[in-house]
């Protein structure tokens, strides 16, 4: 099932690198969905979790992962843990060499994600925190990459500050016409942002 989905994403040009391809093959998406959706785990669509959250569609996880150009040794911040699937894919994409810090505002989701990641052996590479991800995680900054999995009204200043020079942020932002996924590169203390595609994410919560 995973192999067929990944082959399709490679064919469509969503997956471009061996690292992301291997990561998508290794992480069992069915372990990160609620029981009633296990049979749909390898459909290329978002699925409901609980507390108003969703697990992103596989093509979106792959696309966002490709945009940060993963490599061993990276330190990644994820804002919006959900069930932990995206963090696990990032961990595999950096070959479990480095660190993924992920912040979830909903307590029940943070617990659910931590349980999933622990069961599958990711704790140690992935650390789950409960809190307002818009504020980042200053104690572990700077980050090589920041991934935001919910739509922000604007790019949070704290996340830019916690991005290292040359680092990349991938973030969906609410625009007048809808949501746009941006690749943001920090250079010379300033940010350059490039629109990637229109997207549809749940809103980034405040807390």
Swiss-Prot record:
Catalytic activity: [protein]-L-isoaspartate + S-adenosyl-L-methionine = [protein]-L-isoaspartate alpha-methyl ester + S-adenosyl-L-homocysteine
Listed GO MF terms: protein-L-isoaspartate (D-aspartate) O-methyltransferase activity
Record EC number: 2.1.1.77
Pfam family, one: PCMT
GO BP: methylation; protein modification process; protein repair
CDD domains xref list: AdoMet_MTases
Enzyme class: transferase
Chief location bin: cytoplasm
Entries under Gene3D superfamilies matching the protein: Vaccinia Virus protein VP39
GO cellular component annotations of the record: cytoplasm
Active site residues per record: 56
Keywords, sorted A to Z: Cytoplasm, Methyltransferase, S-adenosyl-L-methionine, Transferase
Subcellular localization: Cytoplasm
UniProt-listed InterPro entries: PCMT (IPR000682), SAM-dependent_MTases_sf (IPR029063)
Coiled coil: none
Family statement drawn from the similarity comment of this UniProt entry: Belongs to the methyltransferase superfamily. L-isoaspartyl/D-aspartyl protein methyltransferase family.
Role of this protein: Catalyzes the methyl esterification of L-isoaspartyl residues in peptides and proteins that result from spontaneous decomposition of normal L-aspartyl and L-asparaginyl residues. It plays a role in the repair and/or degradation of damaged proteins.
Protein name: Protein-L-isoaspartate O-methyltransferase
Gene: pcm
